[in-house]
């Protein structure tokens, strides 16, 4: 059987860059890794609590972390940054203070910046969130998948593949359903493919959503 490799790790250094940029001694490496996860979780929790959206999409594409001795630079790539900035102009400052408190930073400065993703539905994380929201609202999985593919096609992608696994529609036996539109060349390293794996809790149990988006060839 074919062994499935993570499409992002497979393309690191060619079309894909690292989300965490720092150097550490082997002894401190795990601590730095834990710290990165804590920062990301902290930001996601704050945004979940702060933003109440009808569609249920938070719109976080990815969170990049760059570390220096005295500074931690965090860049949040969002599909809908207005949701965080509108209404309260001081929200980013609030978020910064909140993360700084939880991480107990004394000698290090934390700086958070927000970058807007031009086409939100070209990002697999935002698309997976959209599908998860639809499934939570008991929309038929086929309808949710077709709508997601429609949105990515409008965003100007070359191909998209969506897969949902688990007890779909509450059926007793778990199964895998998938749909593909356009080309998704997973074995071509030059092909710029974005990928996301997302878990959603529904009333029937846990479902796994995977999204592959073929953007272009470099």
Curated annotation (Swiss-Prot):
Keywords of this entry: Chloroplast, Plastid, Ribonucleoprotein, Ribosomal protein, RNA-binding, rRNA-binding
Cross-referenced Pfam families: Ribosomal_S3_C
Keyword rRNA-binding set for record: yes
Superkingdom in the source lineage: Eukaryota
Residue intervals of the KH type-2 domain: 47-118
Record flagged with keyword Plastid: yes
A biological-process GO annotation: translation
Annotated GO MF terms: rRNA binding; structural constituent of ribosome
InterPro entries in the record: KH_dom-like_a/b (IPR015946), KH_dom_type_2 (IPR004044), KH_sf_prok-type (IPR009019), Ribosomal_S3_C_sf (IPR036419), Ribosomal_uS3_bac-typ (IPR005704), Ribosomal_uS3_C (IPR001351), Ribosomal_uS3_CS (IPR018280)
GO cellular component: chloroplast; cytosolic small ribosomal subunit
SUPFAM superfamilies to which the protein is assigned, alphabetical: Prokaryotic type KH domain (KH-domain type II) (SSF54814), Ribosomal protein S3 C-terminal domain (SSF54821)
Locations listed in the record: Plastid, Chloroplast
Complexes and interactors: Part of the 30S ribosomal subunit.
Family as reported in the entry's similarity comment: Belongs to the universal ribosomal protein uS3 family.
Identification of the protein by name: Small ribosomal subunit protein uS3c
Species in which this protein is naturally found: Lotus japonicus
